[in-house]
């Protein structure tokens, strides 16, 4: 099938430099409305990938996001949110970006063009057959990502990808390709815009669904979140109040004693059950 680089096609808008601020903002918002529809069409593939990942993570497997530039930064961002949000170790979801941590703030020349570097970085993490590699690249042509996915697949490791072009080279290396076709960017070729928004949405969907299925959420609450600041301590305290009907002071003391909402609630209920016996 033909590889069409939609991400490089001309914008549907012209003379951007002659538009008013309001016109530019309204145009961008109009284009952004298309992103959610494109993501919705990709849900069957997202579901397929997530369904394959869940049992792997339950057996100790990890998820590696790999990308360059905006795509790499979004992968690192999503991975970095898993420990504080769900109380998981930082080794469960790992974001790798071409050029390393320096590339999070500054471009690293030619880093994404190295076909072998991605796999070398995965080897440093002792990647194994229970793990999953998810490549992220709007174009679907990033050598750093493609090389890592190709070698991972040769070693029997599950591969997925998120791209904004159909039938891309990256998609051919994925067991489950997620193609989210958002159309030409408002600024021609600026894939940090709609493509980046779509990537962020899909990464949210993947990681959140997996964490819910792993039992890291109860009801609709982040009962395993890390208590890293006063706002989160207050949030956790109010969760306990809602669940156990304690006053604020007792709920907060219980939370701080046990370190998480889930542990605090379980300990309180065990204690009460023992008392009643």
Curated annotation (Swiss-Prot):
It catalyses: N-acetyl-D-muramate 6-phosphate + H2O = N-acetyl-D-glucosamine 6-phosphate + (R)-lactate. This is N-acetylmuramic acid 6-phosphate etherase. Homodimer. Pathway: Amino-sugar metabolism; N-acetylmuramate degradation. It holds the Pfam family GKRP_SIS_N. One of its GO terms (biological process) is amino sugar catabolic process. Keywords: Carbohydrate metabolism, Lyase. The gene is murQ. It is an enzyme of class 4 (lyase). CDD domains: SIS_Etherase. Signal peptide: none annotated. Belongs to the GCKR-like family. MurNAc-6-P etherase subfamily. A lyase-type mechanism (elimination/hydration) is suggested for the cleavage of the lactyl ether bond of MurNAc 6-phosphate, with the formation of an alpha,beta-unsaturated aldehyde intermediate with (E)-stereochemistry, followed by the syn addition of water to give product. Its EC number is 4.2.1.126. GO terms for molecular function: carbohydrate derivative binding; carbon-oxygen lyase activity; ether hydrolase activity. The active site is at 81 (proton donor), 112. Specifically catalyzes the cleavage of the D-lactyl ether substituent of MurNAc 6-phosphate, producing GlcNAc 6-phosphate and D-lactate. Residues 53-216 form the SIS domain. It comes from Bacteroides thetaiotaomicron (strain ATCC 29148 / DSM 2079 / JCM 5827 / CCUG 10774 / NCTC 10582 / VPI-5482 / E50).
